[in-house]
Amino acid sequence: MATNIVGKVKWYNSTKNFGFIEQDNGGKDVFVHKSAVDAAGLHSLEEGQDVIFDLEEKQGKAYAVNLRIK
């Protein structure tokens, strides 16, 4: 799918291990799982944090992968 998308963390719950990223381009909010956070070498995400990510589709839903801090 799409690569190098810029966005901002809308919210992330480290207890539930997921959250959502708001795309700067106005697209739909994107689900982000703890596995993407871990793969980026991060412990958690903070609300309002600027990120860059790629979109991957699984089972008809878009997920943030290859997460990087902007």
From Swiss-Prot:
Asked whether the keyword DNA-binding is assigned, the reply is yes
Q: Which residues cross the membrane?
A: none
- The source's superkingdom equals Bacteria
Any one cellular-component term (Gene Ontology) = cytosol
- Molecular function terms, GO-annotated: DNA binding
- What is the annotated localization of this protein? Cytoplasm
Keywords annotated in UniProt? Activator, Cytoplasm, DNA-binding, Transcription, Transcription regulation
State the PROSITE patterns in the record: CSD_1, CSD_2
Residues of the CSD domain: 7-67
What protein name is recorded for this chain?
Cold shock-like protein CspA
Query: Which gene holds the coding sequence for this protein?
Result: cspA
- Is Nuclease set as a keyword in this record? no
